[in-house]
From Swiss-Prot:
Gene name of this polypeptide: tsf
A Gene Ontology term for the protein's cellular component: cytoplasm
Subcellular locations according to the entry: Cytoplasm
Function: Associates with the EF-Tu.GDP complex and induces the exchange of GDP to GTP. It remains bound to the aminoacyl-tRNA.EF-Tu.GTP complex up to the GTP hydrolysis stage on the ribosome.
Start and end residues of each stretch annotated as Involved in Mg(2+) ion dislocation from EF-Tu: 82-85
One Pfam family named in its UniProt record: EF_TS
PROSITE patterns, sorted: EF_TS_1 (PS01126), EF_TS_2 (PS01127)
GO process annotations (BP): translational elongation
This protein's name: Elongation factor Ts
Protein family (similarity comment): Belongs to the EF-Ts family.
Transmembrane segments: none
GO molecular function, one term: translation elongation factor activity
Length: 278
């Protein structure tokens, strides 16, 4: 039997995050040499990462970081395979660390984020791979949002009380109004609008909706002369449902979101809604 102590096992667990039995086995194979055991566990961990690549990661958490003065904010989605891991402190600490890094580093896109150093000599991609190995599940970072310049706030929604937030919303107003920002963010969490305004809907989507409306109207046997007016009405209905500004406001459905913003004297510059796995 290799010569090592309980303190060596503890040290190895702290260095690698591996389980006790894995650490003991690694120390046995390394004949008590902690450095060699660390290397062996890292190699084993990377092999485990490769094996998990084909598996699905549909659980996880959304984390937000908002500047104290509300001039900037981020949302980060980190996914895992099971809700058991998602509930765990280690997984949530990893997600929070990445969100804090995004807030400081302001990466241009996901590729830049993964390539950036979260710790000296360690990229975010390596950090995620390390979490993958330590937690024993596929861990995926493939989405984040970052706003700055206006009044930024977030709303986080838990779908289950024992899980971390599964839905996160980031909103940016042109001027401070915490009450309106919170209300609109809650509305977005609940109603999941696809676009901010009618002008933001891609032309190809509008044309597709128009074709569907025309075909549906003809199939209903409506008079050809009435077709343009009916189609336009249905298209306006689509805009009302799909755009945030067109939707009835969740906290006062007699008014549209646009009307609520106008009455408050603010405009919504942009928003992002992230739901884990979707």
């Amino acid at each position: 039997m290799a010569n090592y102590t309980a303190a060596d096992v503890k040290k190895l667990r702290e260095l690698t995050g591996a389980g006790m039995m894995d650490c003991k086995k690694a120390l046995d194979e390394a004949e008590g040499n902690v450095e060699k055991a660390v290397e062996a566990l890292r190699i084993k961990g990377q092999k485990g990462v490769a094996k998990r690549e084909g598996r699905s990661a549909e659980n996880g958490a959304v984390v937000s970081i908002i500047a104290d003065d509300n001039t900037s904010g981020v949302l980060v989605e980190l996914k895992c395979e099971t809700d058991f891991v998602a509930k765990g402190e280690k997984f949530q600490n990893v997600a929070t660390a990445i969100a804090e890094h995004v807030a400081k580093a302001a990466p241009a896109d996901l590729e830049a984020l993964l390539a950036s150093e979260i710790e000296p000599g360690k990229t975010v991609q390596a950090y995620v791979d390390e979490a993958n190995a330590n937690l024993g599940e596929k861990i995926v970072l493939d989405r984040f949002a970052q706003f700055s310049g206006g009044f930024v706030t977030a709303y986080m929604h838990r779908t289950m009380p024992d899980l971390p937030p599964q839905i996160g919303v980031l909103v940016e107003l042109d001027k401070p109004n915490a009450e309106i920002a919170k209300g609109v963010a809650q509305h977005i969490a609940a109603f999941a609008p696809k676009y901010l305004s009618k002008e933001d809907v891609p032309a190809e989507v509008v044309e597709s909706e128009r074709r569907v409306a025309e075909e549906t109207t003809r199939a209903e046997g409506k008079p050809e002369a009435a077709l343009p007016k009916i189609v336009e009405g249905r298209l306006n209905g689509f805009f009302k449902d799909a755009t945030l500004l067109g939707q009835p406001y969740a906290l006062d459905n007699k008014k549209s979101v646009q009307k609520v913003l106008e009455e408050a004297g603010v405009s919504l510059k942009r928003f992002s809604r992230i739901k884990v796995g979707i």
